[in-house]
């Protein structure tokens, strides 16, 4: 199994070790712990969990990195989500694309001028400030100018020229998590996910805890040590389990 996961971040490609089976067990325990906690407590716990793994990176990059490493570790770019159709009340299962290509700086056209924005390195309560503080440069007549070299009046004029539709696209692109779930039954539904807490709760099911230990038990009975199992990545453990089950047929 490959033991490196590549993530494309604003400053280039970074390499990370995949999560192990031991890590995944911890995620299950955390998921179970937050089940009946308040939204604020859930946010704090998941934020701290991710920071423990990727604390050397900006806070805004960490959710993206966590999800990329998680996806690489389980060996799947899609998960499955179950929902209840609001109309017929039937239970439906749909695929959920959880892979994001990269985290990068942004370029948008505003009033015939290209504006380049750095991907934020911190979270902002004030969204307008998040945009103005991260504008890096502007392109006029094929020439790029540093934002700081432009007069304050010109800066204000350019920012004011940003249309609502473009503004919404910029804010959307500044989310480290940006996933879309498509659901279909009697009608079609679309749900956007921009919060790592919501995504974590979808991907890590507390009901998996019993199955998790059951799989470990099966592998131990096939002469794998708990230590070696814990050091596997989840995708690898899944392959081993399939081989064991195939041998029993």
Curated annotation (Swiss-Prot):
Regulation: induction: Expressed in the late phase of the viral replicative cycle.
Matching InterPro entries: Baseplate_phage_T4-like (IPR024364)
One GO process term, biological-process aspect: viral tail assembly
Source species of the chain: Enterobacteria phage T4
Keywords annotated in UniProt: Chaperone, Late protein, Viral release from host cell, Viral tail assembly
Protein name: Baseplate hub assembly protein gp51
Function according to Swiss-Prot or TrEMBL: Chaperone that is involved in the formation of the central hub of the baseplate.
Pfam families associated with the record: T4_baseplate
Coiled coil: none
